[in-house]
Amino acid sequence: MPNDAAGAHAGHESRHGCPGGAGRGCTLEPRADPGPGVRRRHQDREEKARWLRSVFVATYGEHVGCGEVVVVRAPGRVNLIGEHTDYNEGFVLPAAIDRDVMIAVRARRDRVVRVRSLNFGETVEFTLDDVRYDHDHTWSNYVRGTLLALGEAGAPLPGMDMVVTGDVPAGAGLSSSAALEVATAVAALAVAGFDLEGRDMALRCQRAENSFVRVNCGIMDQFASVLGKAGYALFIDCRTHECEPVPLPREYCIVICDTGVRRGLRDSEYNLRRSQCEEAVMLLRGRGMRVRSLRDVSPRELARVEAWLPEAVRARARHVVLENERVLHSVEALRAGRVDEFGRLMVASHASLRDLYEVSCPELDAMVEVALGIPGVAGARMTGAGFGGCTVNLVHEDAVDEFRRTVLTRYTRKVNPSRLSFEPQVYVCRAEDGAGVMTLEE
């Protein structure tokens, strides 16, 4: 972060702090029995973990290495609201979802690391004494970078064998990369017998993606994967790293619709949007405002000075400033049980991303339009960086079956099939617990 932290308005820090004044931890009230559907998913996950352990033994042998085979998991995440605010030190409201990356791992007696990816059908091998970027197996760099970051944190990592699998769709904006990083961290720390506080682990995983993989991501993805709680979204302050659990309505499901479009312009356009936000801050400082980031600008303050900003920069700044306000209002609405209000905020967020930040695409717009025409949908918006990927929808549990039957049929009638890289998909999700070691009953 910049060193001119004192330049931010002190009043903004209190106005834009975590509602309720959360400290470093997330304090949760116990929830009632989650119901048979959740229990069934947990049983299915345990069966998958036992299967993965058997694949591990078939791959590496029963008694090779040292110690037991450990199975860990880390979830993907969906951002409910708060898009392109994280790198502006703003606010986000993600939820960990019940799609995850699983790793079976066992320590070795040397410094060699072997990783078998079932999704890619590939195996890589390297030594902890010489961790280098792999241009041929790019998926493995999330593993390599995470192990390197943990070693830099002082974790006494042994060599290890891993088998990795996952059902988080890649490239869809659901943070499959963060899930792989976090699962790697949990697995490595488990076999090393080394404890790392959840936030520290998330920050190490972010460091791996920033420094080793060279993707300039914010903290949201890793925080959600580590700190997620079943039945809750996480309100995250991307400046202070404070988080608060926000209860989600039990009678609603998170439904993710994959447009089938992958984000060809994402990297260049993402970098452009980020530079435009930085330009806005520089220009606002030139007008005498003491701001460190767009997080420090209120809608009223922006309205007074936005005429001085170039048109594109003005639009980007307006989105970020108003999106931060939408996140804060969303937290209040969800805490008060005002689902319809939260849904309206989701729709407003999508319109802002489409018209002001200009990161939507015809397919995302079509998916949102179709979803909002189906009964039982409280809200819908694009989620992720944009230019393709997924929408997130809040759908009443009684309407989910009809939604699944209807949404893709109507969507495919509205879009050009030649633009689709993959078959569109619908994923019905619930907010899930964050990463951890799995306990398997024999």
Go through each PLM region and give its residues.
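Glycine/serine-rich anion-binding loops at beta->alpha junctions
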Residues: 73-78, 82-89, 167-184, 376-394
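A short glycine/serine-rich beta->alpha loop
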Residues: 68, 87-91, 128-136, 166-174, ...
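C-terminal nucleotide
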Residues: 25-26, 32-77, 81, 102, ...
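Phosphate-handling active-site elements
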Residues: 152-161, 188-204, 396-410, 414-418
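Short Gly/aromatic-enriched secondary-structure transition segments
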Residues: 89-96, 273-274
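Fold-level recognition of mixed alpha/beta catalytic cores in primary-metabolism enzymes, strongest
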Residues: 173-256
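Hydrophobic alpha-helical hairpins/lids featuring a short glycine-rich hinge
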Residues: 123-157, 161-168
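Acidic, glycine-rich active-site loops and adjacent beta-strand->loop/helix elements
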Residues: 77-78, 99, 109, 119-122, ...
